[in-house]
A protein has these predicted regions:
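Conserved beta-strand-loop-alpha-helix junction that forms the acyl-donor binding cleft
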Residues: 83, 111-121, 137-145
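Conserved beta-strand in the GNAT
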Residues: 54, 60-68, 75-80
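A conserved beta-turn-beta hairpin within the catalytic core of GNAT-like acetyltransferases
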Residues: 68-77, 86, 105-107, 132-137
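Conserved acetyl-CoA-binding loop-helix of GNAT-fold acetyltransferases
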Residues: 81, 87-100, 122, 126
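A short beta-loop-alpha structural element at the N-terminal edge
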Residues: 3-18, 132
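Conserved GNAT acetyl-CoA-binding A-motif
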Residues: 102-114
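Conserved active-site tyrosine of GNAT-family acetyltransferases
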Residues: 43, 124, 129
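Conserved GNAT-fold acetyl-CoA-binding loop/helix
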Residues: 21-44
Length: 145
């Protein structure tokens, strides 16, 4: 399979939101309960194509990363990969790109991962991230790039 990576376009907002819902609904439902309107509003509030890298296999959106600058930190809002395309290097490629950007900018790279998503926490630890703090629902992780 060949994957292409590029910056998102405004016109992809709906497809990105659908992928977000597909992958994240189970975790969010278990922690807080899922509210369609709240999720759509929150997604729209934070949607910024300049901070989003999309991954396609041919014309199908199969993953994305969403990054924000927060002071002296490059913060990963989300790395999402379609379940049928997980464990094929997409998440690692997206994460390595963010870490490289952090190094260029001499910034720390941070993120939060749900405590119930043990697989994701292990993925980030494998890539050098450490748990620095926690909230009631998430681990706060960081990496000095």
């Amino acid at each position: 399979m060949t994957y292409s990576y590029r910056k998102a376009e405004q016109t992809e907002k709906e497809a990105i939101f659908k992928l977000y819902c597909l992958v994240m609904r189970g975790y969010i439902s278990e922690i807080w309960g899922w509210n369609d309107q709240w999720q759509e509003n929150d997604f729209s509030t934070h949607f910024n194509p300049k901070g989003i890298t999309v991954v396609h296999e041919e014309s199908e959106l199969v993953g994305y990363s969403h990054v924000e600058n927060r002071g002296n930190q490059l913060f990963i809002r989300m790395i999402v990969v379609h379940p049928h395309h997980q464990r094929k290097g997409i998440g690692s490629t997206l994460l390595e790109s963010v870490v490289a950007s952090g190094k260029e900018q001499s910034e720390k790279v941070g993120l939060e991962v749900f405590k119930i998503n043990d697989e994701a926490r292990k993925f980030y630890e494998k890539h050098g991230f450490n748990v620095e703090d926690e909230t009631s629902s998430s681990y706060v992780m960081g990496l000095i790039a």
